[in-house]
Amino acid sequence: LIPSQFLGFSWYNQADLGAQLKYDFDWWGKQRATLEAALDQAHAAEAQRSAAALALQYAVADTYFGWQADQARLQLADQALATQQQFSRIADLRVKQGVDLPDEAQKARAQLAAVQEMRVALEGSAKIRRVSLASLLGVAPEQLPELQPRPLPRVDEGIPANAALDLISRRPDIAASRWQVEAALRQTDAARAEFFPDFSISAMAGLSSIDLGKLFTAGSRTFALTPALHLPIFNGGALKANYGVSKAQLDAAIAQYDSTVLGAAREVATQALGAQQIAARRVVQRTRVDAQRQLLANAQARAAQGVRDARESLVAKAQWLQQRDAAVQLQAQAVATDLALVKALGGGYRDASAADRNADATSSVTAGARP
């Protein structure tokens, strides 16, 4: 409505439509090293998640089988309690009849109280393990399904012949440390490449017009090709500092990897030695259980024949139950040690990223070897 000469300025509309492409020749491998470092970091994070999952699985299994061991010992404690109650009743009767001194009845009551105390402790341990199991599973104790007592699993007495480096190398924490070293190596390569010239080229093509109606005409076409050369001349100090940091991070990653491997080897050796010791103790304990079972059978036979009273067979039964309880404890230790050994060996973890990389390398070699 008002002419532009009276306003002191003018305006116009401009329409632009285009695309831009930039290509870095990456002669020194900086971009490739940066990409590989990021991928290695992602693989390390995945391995760390697997390590956390393995730790959780081990805690759940160890707590569950600990609860089963408490249940097995509670069953033996019930039998021991019934045996000791029967023995205490006989002792009280003999004191009333004047056959024994009151001290014998007091001894029987003390032994009965010891069995009752052990049973209360086992009940408390089972309840604590159940609460711990619910916490590990992320549910409230009342939401945990009802657990049923089951026999403890059989544990093979021995360890795999290849329980050394072959299986240790599968541990997720070692895999994570290895990927961290790989990432640090790639970051060091990228920092080294910063010292060399960087050549890139940019291309732009599109349409530009101050008249929207003429945007798609031939006269509105634009094109530009711009080469660029970066010479790291004036920032040598910063590049040296960055390279020094990368080298320090690489040294730290290597030290962490060495520490992880040594710790894993020590853990496996400790658990394997513990498994061997428990296996030897279980052999001795089975002999003691069998011997005590034979003593119980002999005492029961004498009681049936009237040669001895029932107290001898009750004492023999109490001792037999004690030996069985010790055997259950050793079996529980064997299960716990076996679980710890499985965890120390990586729990069957396989580094899929490393396997894929090895498969790709094998395929490349095979393809290159074909005529």
Describe the predicted segments one by one.
Residues 1-20, 143-160, 189, 202-242, ...:
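Small/polar, glycine/serine/threonine/aspartate-rich low-complexity segments that form flexible
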Residues 25-53, 79, 103, 107, ...:
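Sec/SRP-type N-terminal targeting helices
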Residues 31, 40, 47-163, 274, ...:
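Periplasmic alpha-helical coiled-coil/stalk elements that build and connect Gram-negative outer-membrane
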Residues 148, 290-315, 339-356:
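A glycine-biased, small/acidic residue-tolerant capping/turn segment at secondary-structure junctions
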Residues 155, 264, 305, 326-371:
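Acidic, low-complexity, intrinsically disordered peripheral segments
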